[in-house]
UniProtKB/Swiss-Prot annotation:
The gene is pgi. This is Glucose-6-phosphate isomerase. GO terms for molecular function: carbohydrate derivative binding; glucose-6-phosphate isomerase activity; monosaccharide binding. It comes from Actinobacillus pleuropneumoniae serotype 3 (strain JL03). PROSITE patterns: P_GLUCOSE_ISOMERASE_1, P_GLUCOSE_ISOMERASE_2, P_GLUCOSE_ISOMERASE_3. Belongs to the GPI family. Pfam families: PGI (PF00342).
Amino acid sequence: MQNINPTQTAAWSALEQHKADNLNIPQLFAEDANRFDKYHLNFEQQILVDFSKNAINQKTLELLRQLANECGLASATEAMFSGQKINRTENRAVLHTALRNRSNTPVLVDGKDVMPEVNAVLAKMKDFCERIISGSWKGYTGKAITDVINIGIGGSDLGPYMVTEALRPYKNHLNMHFVSNVDGTHIAEVLKKVNPETTLVLVASKTFTTQETMANALTAREWLLAAVKDESAVAKHFAALSTNAKEVAKFGIDTANMFEFWDWVGGRYSLWSAIGLSIALSLGFENFEALLSGAHAMDNHFRTAPIEKNIPTTLALIGIWNSNFLGAETEALLPYDQYLHRFAAYFQQGNMESNGKFVGRDGSPVTHQTGPIVWGEPGTNGQHAFYQLIHQGTKLIPCDFIAPAQTHNPVGDHHAKLLSNFFAQTEALAFGKSKETVEAEFVAAGKNLADVAEIVPFKVFTGNKPTNSILVQKITPFTLGALIAMYEHKIFVQGVIFNIYSFDQWGVELGKQLANRILPELQNAEKISSHDSSTNGLINQFKAWR
């Protein structure tokens, strides 16, 4: 990938000047009654992306596209898809796209096609899923599996948990449980719910050394052996999503039940790999394949659609406009679908771990904003929690509103009520409510304006708050796969333009190193003085209270 400082491009300078036009969303709609027609894109007639309620015009988009071209987006995209080692700090290719490459077109890393190995792992996953789901796989007392616990953290947990929740309508009879936190409460509460005779534990750790994951896995192992008192039972109740065959075997897991993935799969992009085994077990392998197919379709769109019609690129560019030029520091993901209740948390990791960097590809600190803070909750819950600040606060918070046109649960008029809020919120954020409108409402209600003059300012909404509306025909494995891939590619595009490396996560390491240094200090009652006064004080109080 090229090393291009975006702030030194002609497009960046032009965008800085263009910002002075102070585009206003209500005014843009007033000037063009058909604005929606020009500012939305459609993916396979299943996902509609409306970006008309942003403070942009054609000039904005032209300059943003020029910025993408000047920053080498096209060549960077081909570099990723073709297996070049674009993760320079770890000298790795970035090929989550190969995991869902349903066309089987060869993808080369160091001259070797990775697709045969990808397909071999998928075939192994399919066979394993069929045995567990059908009941032919038996536990140590000869009973079929009823419960599956996925033990992982970060990408080994967030993605599988998000997808299994999002696609709950497609679930089979297996009960799924996810354990991530090293807090013993998490594993303890899950183990209370399950029977060791009928439980399968998936241990998701590439190295099989991840501290949190292995602590939980060893606790689950002790729990099983407390019930059965036979080490051979471990092989009937544990499987590994890992590449460390030696440690897997040492744990007691049959390496025939070890599902591999590769160093070109980043953790936060790994749900498409063997890390997605919990998804396949929960939904059935055919639905896991449909998830892959949806992502592959979006990959093809991203790779081949011209920039004017390219959905992930358009969303990425508008995000850069909002954050780097209009001053937004956060982005809210607001799914109007309860099944998507972990979607924002998933892309909180996806975006913030990818683009939360302050060093450019040239090794120097950047002078521009990089990745935004990403957060969100399902609608309509958020409306009764934090929308107040979005509507009337002093922070600019661009929002993505996501909703399905068809619900899996057509209960009364619930879905119409839900979607009426979905449509109303973006309209309210864009157009607000003027002082004149507030006064007219008071008059219509029979109030004397003199009596309510003090209240009027508090009921004014300034509007001009940017939103994207993403309307999905129905949340299915295919459309969810496409939606996830859409956001993945958005993150990639922004990383290219920010001139950072999006596929490492060195920020995770320092805390781990310090925790490993502190852990032995907690094993005794001695007072600690080896840290700063704050850390010493906290550790010593912990020792006094435990």
